[in-house]
């Protein structure tokens, strides 16, 4: 260190950081973001919510369940919880208000449903985790699918119980 100085160490750290993040696998992250943008601009998020509302509409609390279902579907398109929550909230919240849903149920449902974007593959954090820990991305996606679906069903069951127990 005294003879060579910090030059070799800083060069090593610089190359290590570049090599870690200049991987082909990381190129999927901007593509997920681009696909989510196309889905939003193309009206897919609204179509997903309308389809989910038509499927779940016959149940009490159906629009809240539809918001969770649409969040899971949109999360599987874009891979981001923040984008999922923002997009589905923009579509579902006005409809839920129009149908007389309470603010607590509406916002709680949309906040919880937005978290599905990180669980249901493709997920940006799962890709980053797989690259940093040198794990198989496909296996991580397969492992995350079941908990994501269980969370979605759990949210929908919680909504069904909530709307029966809490009046209004």
Regions found by a protein language model. Give the residues of each.
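Alpha-helical transmembrane segments of multi-pass membrane transport proteins
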Residues: 1-168
